[in-house]
Amino acid sequence: MSSSTYSPIPELNRLKEFEENVYPEAFSDGFELFEYGDVSSLGSDAPTEMRDGLIPFAQANHSGSFYALWRREDRADLATVPVIFCGDEGDLYIAAGNMREFFRLLAVDDADDADDVPARDAYISWLERTFGLTPVEDPAALYDAVLLEHGRAFCDWWLTFDDEDSIIEDLLDELTDLEDAQGARG
């Protein structure tokens, strides 16, 4: 990996190249890559377990929320680990199960922000040309699937260093509801 390489993840490096090519135009509202692995966004008092387990890589909005990779199961290929949303107002959730799912979510069109993302069409074309991917058609269904797949493990991991987090309790409640609904359909 050269010193000019953004990250150890080829997919993320390609996104960085795309972002640089369309800059200053936005391709997803509020999204912007920042220094890969910059743990300062976790806060100076973040526990070691959090600093070791999360790899921040992008701002999610204009007010301090960010995305981070969750080093799940010590996977060597970081493009296969879940992407976590860490909100500036305390929100915390699993945004995508892996990097390519995340890229698809970035392409979702929100009619309210159409004027703020002039490079969205260029991004969608790039996404299809580069990875053969299209925008997620049903973000809520993807969220549910990702929560079912990774939610319990993520909450268990988070609770190893923060056992009084109401956001995690909410995630666990949401996960239990999803599991119950899935069992009822079973």
Regions of interest found by a model, annotated:
Residues 77, 103, 119-122, 178:
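Solvent-exposed, non-transmembrane amphipathic alpha-helical segments
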Residues 1-79, 136-186:
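A surface-exposed partner-binding patch
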Residues 18, 102-105, 126, 130, ...:
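Residues that form generic nucleotide/phosphate-binding pockets
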Residues 81-119:
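Compact, glycine/acidic-enriched structural inserts
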Residues 111, 115-155:
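An amphipathic alpha-helical core segment
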